[in-house]
């Protein structure tokens, strides 16, 4: 007997941005099925036409591609089970809905929105869980509506929906791959709308039809879909189909354990891309929102390939996963520390060129945009930046002479003789043949020692004049990278400026 090929899907609606929770769902489906050498499918669920956002589908695809989550089948790639956009499958849903009507598993409902709302308010006042009152359930299905009334409405072309008939007083049970056995009482389940008055199916109906026809073996989705399970399982039963295996992922929570929402921070993957987070860090972070490799491992940084190899649903927890941005920031720094200089240069060089178009520089552009120069900057700043773009924005002094000087630093570090010392030391620097960190350090210490001063008497003023700020990498290495001409120019110009500040 040939083993069934594993198949999973990510089925977003094109209603806007990709939520980080959606990215996690896509990632877990991808990791699970790729470990099993199966197929990962992208399906677009666009049956709710009122919520469709122009361009959202393209943004979803672009974001998944950015994250490295590449489907085997999709609207763009095609496949043996298409179409992969639900609005292109309407005839399929109609066919299966007709089967349910013929089998007395579904019925026409002509209730108006006003009637439904009136019924809902009445049930709320009575302390009942709102659900459809089955006014239009036909007599032959155990209801009270005569078939003649239904025929009359049909002849009048009155708008209607089609509802599933949920059986009374039955237990609906399934084994969740994360939560274990889960049971529902059918008395709590509403007669779900399957087909809307516009001829489009609801999510519940279309997803069951498609999941079966596309032969998915596992459905991995968020916990918010758990209450819908009995409706889905009943539909599988009505059709006589074997349901796939299900796994419902834990909620994503804010640090205060409230549900993750835009009110407390960014929830769109695009927001994090704009801020400069890398795909590796985001994927690594999202993978650990509910999953861990288990006891005995201290590893926290994983490549996508390592995640595919080690991921398992058995290690996904039931409890809500805390979305801790500090952990994401830490991961981003780990990737920057280990990333090749060539990769970083490919990102920061276009940023630098854009900055050079906006503002002039006294430095030689051919030098500061060279790979050799940028490599030196990267090695000095790796431990200090949180994002790749900060190699340019956090330390602009490597590319532009400072236009201002940190006033607090000047007040704290300048004495009456500081400028005199600086003028004298400039001549020492100008005489250096080898403008290296070691030579600069040796000359500075030799310069201050006879004067009974500590090296700090010049280190801090030199840093402020050459960078504009009182913090940064090793001063001596920073000066070496900047080069003799830039350092002497900045000290000479800065002395005249800080006279007014000190």
From Swiss-Prot:
Chain sites annotated for binding ATP: 262
UniProt keyword Protein biosynthesis, yes or no: yes
Database matches in InterPro entries: aa-tRNA-synth_I_cd-bd, aa-tRNA-synth_I_codon-bd_sub2, aa-tRNA-synth_I_CS, aa_tRNA-synth_I_cd-bd_sf, Glu-tRNA-ligase_bac/mito, Glu/Gln-tRNA-synth, Glu/Gln-tRNA-synth_Ib_cat-dom, GluQ/Sye
Record motif 'KMSKS' region, residues: 259-263
Species annotation: Chlorobium phaeobacteroides (strain DSM 266 / SMG 266 / 2430)
GO CC annotations on file: cytoplasm
BP-aspect Gene Ontology terms: glutamyl-tRNA aminoacylation
Protein name, UniProt field: Glutamate--tRNA ligase
